[in-house]
Amino acid sequence: MDQTIKKKLARNWFKTLQEVICHEIEELEAKKNIFKIKNWERGKNSNEGGGQFRILENGKIFEKVGVNFSEVYGKFSKEFRNRIPGGDKNPNFWAAGISVVMHMKNPHVPAMHFNTRYIYTSHGWFGGGMDVTPCLKDKSLEKWFHNELKKSCNKHNKNFYKKYKKWCDEYFYLPHRKEPRGIGGIFFDYKKENWEKDFSFVREVGISFKNIFREIILKKYKKKWSNKQREIQLEKRGRYVEFNLLYDRGTKFGLQTNGNVEAILMSLPPVAKWK
């Protein structure tokens, strides 16, 4: 399949998924709170792509949720090109993807994160994943969440869940705190074995995320919570901020490729605390 077609298919899927996820979120909010939409362009002097980020704040369920789509292209800086696969052979790049970060009002509902992307340099690959960060322990939620991920992965390859869970556990870890960010999930990168199969798996991950976040929210958003639990939530958000600013690949990639700062930092919670 021609690379132009691959890019178009990936780009169209990510944009469609943005619409689907935003619609689901607004339905959960009973359409009383809707997304603010902002389009942006990369590069002031030439067409280098751009994207659209959508933010919904102060809802009955979501304190802040961002759903970002982007399609950008251009040339890596000399300093950055050697850090990206294929960048040493061809400094030109194209990248498209969707990123979702949810910070909930109720401390019983965990923060949730999802992203998938397709990047092309001298060759192309998929990356992405999803993870959940509760501030209050819930072993039954953890077991259910990982079982859902395993079922989705097993539709494509029996080895994916174990492999991508391990990768997620290693990736979403704060070395300076010596603690994981949350209860894990799946994470994959540089996926380029078979384009059609890889793309099918990426679509599966996206639909699974939509179903998972809906189920978790409906189970938990009406539970009563205390001021103490809110304090725990705010401290846990502080850890979330630390990871995203210090270690997150997407944040680094966006800032190094002149992405939209507001869209890149949409993952940050509206309120957080440190002790």
Listing of model-derived features with the role each one plays in the protein:
Residues 2-85, 191-246:
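Gly/Pro-rich turn-and-neighbor structural signature
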Residues 51-128:
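Internal mixed beta-strand/loop scaffold within catalytic domains of large alpha/beta enzymes
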Residues 78-80, 109-111, 138-141, 253-255:
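Short helix/loop capping segments that flank catalytic or ligand/cofactor-binding pockets
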Residues 94-96, 125-133, 179-193, 240-242:
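Glycine-rich, often proline-containing surface loops adjacent to acidic residues and nearby aromatics
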Residues 104, 251-275:
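Long, contiguous binding/interaction regions
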Residues 122-166:
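Compact, glycine/acidic-enriched structural inserts
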